[in-house]
Amino acid sequence: MKEIQRVSPVVLKSTPVKTEKRDNWEVVMEYHGEGDGPFLVDLSHRPRFDLQDSNLAAIKPFGIVLPEKPGDCVLEKGVLANRMNRTQVSLYNLNGQDNAGIPDEPGFTDVTESTLCVALIGKNVFSICEKLTALDFMDKQRKAPFLFQGPFSHVPCQLVTLNKAGDK
C-alpha cells in the first residue's frame, strides 16, 4: 500500500539542515544560516479544523473552553481557538499530537490540507507586519491573544497575536 505524501505550500530558498517526517509531511526543523530572526515558521503540517455550530458555548473540543466573542482567542493544551463569528471557530493544534484526528461530532471540518499555516516569530516582528498590513497589532484596547481577520499583504487570512512583546 502506498503512503500519502503531503507537501507544504511553503517553499523557502534556504537549505534544510535537519528534517523530520511527521504524518507524511516533510518538516524542516532547521535551515542553514538561520541567523537571529525574525523567523517565518511553516506550520502547515499541524492539524487544523473549522467548527460551526449555533450553540458553540455547549461544545468543548479537545477539552478547552471556546472564546466567547469574535476576535478573541484561547491558547490552551496546545490548541489555538480563534472565534471568527457567532457560529464559527477555527482550531489549530500547534503542539499536541501530530495525529490528532477530527473530533467525532457534527460541525467539524478538517482544513489541514486546504489551508496554509505560518508563524512569524522573533524580534522586530511588528515592524515587519506594519509594512504589510494596516492592522494595528499593538492596539492598547486588545489583550493578547487576539484575532484579526483581514488582509496581510493583500491575502485574506486569520492573524493571531499571541503576545505583544515581539521577542517571546
Regions found by a protein language model. Name each.
Residues 1-168:
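Basic, glycine/lysine-rich polyanion-binding surfaces/domains
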